[in-house]
Amino acid sequence: MSEQTPHHCGSVAVIGRPNVGKSTLTNALVGAKVSIVSNRPQTTRHRLLGIATYPEGQLVLVDTPGLHKVQKRAMNRVMNRAARGSLEGVDAGLLVIEAGRWDEEDSLAFNVLRDAGIPVVLVVNKIDRLKDKGALLPFLQEVTAGRDFSSVHPISAQKRNGLEALVRDVLALLPEAPPMFGEDEITDRSQRFLAGELVREQLMRQLGEELPYATTVEIERFTEDGNLLRIGAVIWVEREGQKAIVIGKGGTRLKEIGAKSRLQMERLFGAKVFLETWVRVREGWSDDEAALKAFGYE
């Protein structure tokens, strides 16, 4: 009788500077959208778990806000605290960087993981965007020189290239243990939380360069009526002028934000969604620790 293959399970922090593809990687490993994605830095503001279950084991991925040096505003400080706090009790860390680029914030992220005393896997994302493929090996040699990594994985999270080997090596670092979550569970966050994040994703995608950072979303109502979810979302901004921009001429932009958010919710929740959205002003909320706490920032 052959021995049963050991089952490995543990928590893995996904750490890196802003906009390296941490959330895209988390979603790719989970196989579902649990973390919102945009091409803007600092899209992720909250710590959340993505649960990736395989026959050989289970990865409990701790997706975090991007670590950054500048901490002038309360929002930045809260996000850095969330990222650092995610390392408590984890079994391993994924340092996600962008192929061809290493800067001070990458060094900061590496140092945070190193100081946590856990095995660190280097994940070099966006290799599909490298114009000079021959530059990858010298870049890897430069980054790994003098730094201790358990393994190094060049990948494309968006195209799902290189993930199989990554999963295999990360599972090998985790303790032999039964799964922490059921096979059908993909995140520890509620549908209510995810609904707010999906609205915020559309704000990040549809608004100008700076305005998304002055917005947050609060779900005021979330009720189930058979196969229908009734959701009321408040978009908070910091100034009246910003409110007008979010609403758009004749309410067109707000309608577009609502329509695309609703479609994403229906896809994720597998139910019909009736979504209402409003825009309200709370001056200076992103630099106000009390306001951030009221909006659910850790």
UniProtKB/Swiss-Prot annotation:
It comes from the Bacteria. PROSITE patterns: G_ERA, KH_TYPE_2. It is found in: Cytoplasm; Cell inner membrane. Residues 199-283 form the KH type-2 domain. GO terms for biological process: ribosomal small subunit assembly. Keywords: Cell inner membrane, Cell membrane, Cytoplasm, GTP-binding, Membrane, Nucleotide-binding, Ribosome biogenesis, RNA-binding, rRNA-binding. GO terms for cellular component: cytosol; plasma membrane. Residues 16-23 are annotated as: G1. Residues 8-176 form the Era-type G domain. It holds the Pfam family KH_2. Residues 125-128 are annotated as: G4. Residues 63-66 are annotated as: G3. Its main location: cytoplasm. One of its GO terms (molecular function) is small ribosomal subunit rRNA binding. Residues 155-157 are annotated as: G5. An essential GTPase that binds both GDP and GTP, with rapid nucleotide exchange. Plays a role in 16S rRNA processing and 30S ribosomal subunit biogenesis and possibly also in cell cycle regulation and energy metabolism. Belongs to the TRAFAC class TrmE-Era-EngA-EngB-Septin-like GTPase superfamily. Era GTPase family. Monomer. This is GTPase Era. It comes from Stenotrophomonas maltophilia (strain R551-3).
